[in-house]
Regions:
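Conserved, structured core segments of small domains
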Residues: 2-109
Length: 109
């Protein structure tokens, strides 16, 4: 049985970044501001995990825990990487986690 969640209960959201060419080199002047911005989101208990993709380094994935996708969307809109043109596009997807200690909806067999 899958337990359904009521509105207002935190869920997981993935923020996907598609980066510009030569992203690793071009991010250097903005990295400190981006990391500080991410740490502030962690302190607010919105951002759970984040990091660049590798092989190739052409984007990043950020995991949020929030009541709505707005936390991830607002993060992207003000992220120094986005504001400085390092991210070609971004998108937020709800991630319905079902297995694991931090899963929001647990499957019981």
């Amino acid at each position: 049985m899958v337990r359904r969640f009521c509105e207002g209960i935190a869920m997981h959201y993935l923020l996907f970044y598609d980066a510009v060419d030569n992203y690793e080199e071009r991010r250097k002047p903005h990295r400190e501001a981006h990391i500080a911005y991410a740490r502030a989101a962690i302190a607010r208990e919105e951002l759970v995990l984040a990091g660049a993709l590798s092989g190739p380094a052409d984007g990043a994935v950020l995991l949020f825990r929030a009541d709505s996708p707005a936390a991830a969307e607002n993060f992207a809109k003000s992220d120094p990487y986005v504001l400085n043109g390092l991210i070609k596009q971004w998108r937020v997807r709800e991630w319905r986690t079902v297995v694991g200690a931090a899963a929001e909806v647990k499957i019981h067999w």
